[in-house]
Amino acid sequence: MKFMGANELREKYLSFFESKDHLRLQSFPLVPKNDKSLLLINAGMAPLKPYFTGLEEPPKRRITTCQKCIRTGDIENVGKTSRHGTFFEMLGNFSFGDYFKSEIIPWAWEFITETLGIPKDKLYVTIYLNDDEAYDIWTSKTDVDPSRIFRLGKDDNFWEIGVGPCGPCTEIHFDRGEGKVETVEEFLEASDADRIVEFWNLVFTQFDKDEEGNYNELAQKNIDTGMGLERIATIMQGVDNIFEIDTVKNILNKACELTNAKYGEDKDKDVSLRIITDHGKSVTFLICDGVQPSNEGRGYVLRRLLRRAARHGRLLGVKGIFLNEMVDAVVENYGEAYPELKEKADYIKKIIKLEEERFNETIDSGMDILMSYISEMEEKNEKVLSGAKAFKLYDTYGFPLELTQEILEEKGLELDIENFNKEMKEQRERARNARGESSYMGSEESPVNKVDASIVTEFDGYVNLELNSKVIVLGNNEEFKSELKEGEEGFLLTDKTPFYAEMGGQVGDRGNITSETGMAIVTDCKKNVGGKFVHYIKVIEGSLKEGQEVKLSVDASRRSNICKNHTATHMLHEALKEVLGDHVNQSGSYVDEERLRFDFTHFAALTEEELEKVELLVNEKIMTVSVVDTKEMSLDEARNSGATCLFDEKYAEKVRVVSVGDFSKELCGGTHVANSGEIGLFKIVSESGVAAGIRRIEAVTGISALKFMELKNNMLKEAASMLKCNEKDIAKRIAAQAHELKEKDKEIAELKAKLVQGAEDDILKDKVEINGVELVTAELKDVDGNSLRDLADKVRNKLNNGIVVLASDNGGKVNLVAMATKNSLANGVHCGKVIKEVAAVVGGGGGGRPDMAQAGGKNPENIAKALEKAKEVVELLVK
């Protein structure tokens, strides 16, 4: 066989199916759109589910893709084996009610044996036990040796998940060994031994399984095939694992270079290098597709992968930041197929660098705490770390659960995962109750998401805010209805509408719908999971009926304010690019009638000067009264014209480009003002950080901006009145008062210090002796942490062989400190252990070294009990 690189294989596959009249689609982003069942895209067909289910019409009945995928189910095996990985590419061709078995089987054989040139005597085919049709096609329409076809049962060659669409499949296998297998038993044995490997699965979706277990023929039969690019690359390159194929090997070589480790010489180092290679690739693609590190959802998947790779870098001796340098190797090997990697490389590097820096801080503190837990377990001869302690590490210190588990496993210890999950569940319940979760659009099973795919609503609301239409669907949360009556709430679809459905960060329109028999208010307009325009309504008079002619009227004043904010968002985006640099890209937005919110990529808080420049630039462009122009063009034309595209969006071939004079040009389907002058005024309300490398600006326009300025002005007047000065002197007056307060605080601190001075002699009067070790405890009032440490140090200096534990109620908060003489340590004294137990009594925590430790608490009423606890702990330590 001729050697073929992974990039060449990808192109050959897609070109082959293009020659069979398939539409080639670019890979969908890893973040699913309108699919709450998936965290990340994990299969080639996953983003095409709406086409298979009939919720959406496909752009063509024949489609081919190379879909990037992430799977983390076997993450614990990644690195330990040579075939597990979290990132992979799935080659696929799909038919939605077009061709079926008699076409795809010979095409598959043609591609494998002719295009790729794989020897026929190295191939085997499996089919479902009873699929005679597939057997007949294989033997009549290809020249496969019939003795190389094996029939297998449901577990191997039938695809189904519960009830619903399902069907048999045929799989194509490659034999890495010598000789021929003659029987099913020999075939299965060779497969189990990894001598024979499956590399292409052709699924024939031809049945609909009902609740009774009956398999009913589908009217529309589909084809869904999947061939892992990495798997076929191992075959075409004559290697036996994914880390040896050209693209991945190049990235692994980069990992070796950055860690100064050699691959193939040490088993443990090889594991670390494979983890860094795989995870470095995954995090690059995830960040490119808009995922940000966080503690939940897909953001946590990213954080987990990144931190796992960073830790294995440390195991290889890397001291500083290095993972961001892996991006170059990923871009070099995947940049031609995924050009967005090249465009976002600098941004990806910065996000990784920020997260790795953050992790280095986390891992240092977290490792200290975990190792102290492990030391305690070893002292007590315990083998299981409590779930509560692991959860505290995770929740309070940001230490990843998986890292805790890995380190425990390395030490031969276990984790009480059941109680960890219990703690996690309780925390999620608290969070859920706090935010009051709701699902506005209902579940995928609700009627609103079961509207027939053939129903189409024409949007005619860019200019028209009122038009006549016909009701084609009515319903509520439980069922479709022919009529909705006064007082009832539900949803309504029409054949055309002026109502904009929430999309691209812009909220949906509100308004009303009237007919001869009644009237309803439109509380919102959204698209369902199938992309249909859905009007959410409440009938306030009479009734609305299916099939009726109705008049739809958008709230014009509200729409006008939304348009001002949306156009201003585009102008803000461009202004940020001009002031901060081209690395600025939209990360999210929200536009309603009151304000706008814009999230963007940047790596530091904006200075006051930068904010002023951005605000001034937007207002200058508003004053030019530039025409806001919209044009439809092809995606390539839009890109070539310099229009800004969002990396995580999937665009159609025809796109809408919105331009504000010669200042801003973006792809956008939203509604806008006719000219920039309509915005009137733009005012930034706030600037903040929302994630690593992501900043957020909130702003107002028009009358809202004037009201905001008026509010600020009134606040200034009120402040001037309270300070008894002119508005222009407010800053000076505040600075003067701040200086006065600082001086008074200094005087108070000096007075407190004088009160504490000399107190050590009084404290020493209560000294007790425990097995030859002196113990001094005392409760004080209104002594800050620094003064308490100074006092403890003075008391310690007057001890021969002992420990002092002091506690202070300082404004309702407890300060604790323990100090011990060096010779007392030999008697078993350990301040860190003492203070930990003492702090728990006052509702706090802390720790430290054997000779000095400090902590805090929130229950000063328990200080006396805490000091009694100190005595108990010292008695145990110095037995």
From Swiss-Prot:
ATP-binding keyword on record: yes
Superkingdom as given in the UniProt entry: Bacteria
UniProt subcellular location: Cytoplasm
Catalytically driven reaction(s): tRNA(Ala) + L-alanine + ATP = L-alanyl-tRNA(Ala) + AMP + diphosphate
GO biological process: alanyl-tRNA aminoacylation
EC number: 6.1.1.7
Cited NCBIfam families: alaS
Record remark: domains: Consists of three domains; the N-terminal catalytic domain, the editing domain and the C-terminal C-Ala domain. The editing domain removes incorrectly charged amino acids, while the C-Ala domain, along with tRNA(Ala), serves as a bridge to cooperatively bring together the editing and aminoacylation centers thus stimulating deacylation of misacylated tRNAs.
Homology family: Belongs to the class-II aminoacyl-tRNA synthetase family.
PANTHER family to which the protein is assigned, alphabetical: ALANINE--TRNA LIGASE, CYTOPLASMIC, ALANYL-TRNA SYNTHETASE
Annotated protein name in UniProt: Alanine--tRNA ligase
